[in-house]
Amino acid sequence: MKKFILTLFTTLLVCLGTLTVAQADDYLRIGMEAAYAPFNWTQDDDSNGAVKIEGTNQYANGYDVQIAKKIAQEMGKEPLVVKTSWNGLIPALTSGKIDMIIAGMSPTAERKKEIAFSD
C-alpha cells in the first residue's frame, strides 16, 4: 500500500510539473528594469498597450515593451515583463527565469561571453 501511495504521489508531482511547464510556454518572459523612460517604465494601468509585470498589479510600457509585444506576437506567445534590476538581468537570463532581455544592453566583450546578442 505504501508503494502504491508513493507511486501515485510521484506520478501526480510529475504531471503537475509538466502542467507548469506547459503554462509557462504560453508566455514570453521579458527582462527589463521598467524604469528607463522612454524605453521602458512602470505604470498602474494597461493603457496605451502596456504589458503586465509579473507578480505585481503594475504594467510596463515604452519602446522596449512595444518591441517585446511584436516579438511575442510573432512567436505566438503572450508577453510578460519580469521587472529585474540591471545587475540581475544576465543572471535571470542564464538561469531561465526570463527568456530574453530587452533593455538597451550594449554587447560588450564581457557580456558576449555569457549571453548572445541580436544584430
Regions found by a protein language model. Name each.
Residues M1-F4:
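Positively charged n-region of N-terminal signal peptides that target proteins for export
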Residues L6-T7, A37:
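Short amphipathic alpha-helical "recognition" segments used for binding
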Residues T7-T18:
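Bacterial N-terminal signal peptides
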Residues T18-A24:
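Sec/Tat signal peptide C-region and signal peptidase I cleavage site
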Residues T20, P91, F117-S118:
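Short, flexible, glycine/charge-rich loop motifs used to bind or transfer phosphoryl groups or to couple energy/partner
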Residues D25-G104:
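Extracytoplasmic small-molecule ligand-binding "clamshell" domains
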Residues K97-I98, A109-D119:
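Ligand-binding "clamshell"
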